[in-house]
Each structure stands twice: as C-alpha cells, then as structure tokens.
Amino acid sequence: MKQYKTVNNLIGWITFIIAATVYCMTIEPTASFWDCPEFITTGYKLEVGHPPGAPFFMLVANLFSQFASDASTVAKMVNYMSALMSGACILFLFWSITHLVRKLVITDENNITKGQLITVMGSGLVGALAYLSLIHISEPTRLQLIS
C-alpha cells in the first residue's frame, strides 16, 4: 500500500506539471474576449463579480496580481494563476480517477500486483490528460460554431 501511495502521489504531481506547463505555455498575455477582462479586473481591484465561484477566484487572483511589476502585467499574472489552478484541477481529477479505479480493480489492498498498479495509474493518467486535451479542443470548436 505504501508503494501505491508513493507512485500515486508521484504520477499525480507529474500530471500537474504537464498540465500546468501546457496551460502556462498557452496563456493570453493580456485580457481577451468574453468574461476574462471582468475576472481580471475584479481580482485586481477586489470588486463585485457575477459568477458564483468568484470570491475564491478573486482572492487568489488578487494574491497573484500582487506579483505584477506594474498594472500592464496584471492580466498576465492572473492568467498564470488561472493556468496553475487549472493544472491543480487536473491533479485532483487524476487522484479522483485513481481512487475510483482502485476501488474497482484492487480486491486486496495489501497485495497489489504490478499489473493492477499499472492499470490504476494508466486509467488516471489517460482520464486526466484526456480532460486536459478536451479543454483545448472544445474552446476553438465552440468559437468556430459561434462565428
């Protein structure tokens, strides 16, 4: 079981690094269309925003905006924050998938075979990284359908 926890944590954090790197490489350096400028402004100035999850987002965005050298780089810092938080979402998705698959595949928690370990980790990795790629595919497709 200790080996499972070590491998699960290690692969989970590697998944986070992969996701956060991809998201950070593709951030917008300034404000873009839709609701992004509103989120950046409400996070920077701590003003009232309309989405339900806004208070947590605004507080974390304000924390990251404190690292901006001047007002022109606030948008980039908030976009980096969003990329890192999205990477954390992929991390927790990986851990959720491996937890569920472990309950389905492994019958004896004290005797985990290498095949079972590979099955559980592979399921989590495929599920988390498939979600990562779906986000990048769905947004351009949605924009193409609107225009």
Each predicted region: which residue ranges?
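Transmembrane-helix motifs of polytopic, lipid-linked glycan transferases
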Residues: 13, 80-113, 135-136
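Membrane-water interface at transmembrane helix exits
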Residues: 22, 27, 61, 65, ...
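Extracytoplasmic catalytic/substrate-binding loops of multi-pass membrane glycan-assembly enzymes
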Residues: 27-39, 49-61
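Juxtamembrane segments of multi-pass membrane glycosylation machinery
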Residues: 46-52, 60-84, 103, 134-135
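Loop-to-helix entry region of an early transmembrane alpha helix in multi-pass inner-membrane enzymes
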Residues: 55, 68-96, 117, 121, ...
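Short helix- or helix-capping micro-motifs
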Residues: 124-132
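Single conserved hydrophobic/aromatic residue that forms the stacking wall/gate
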Residues: 135-147
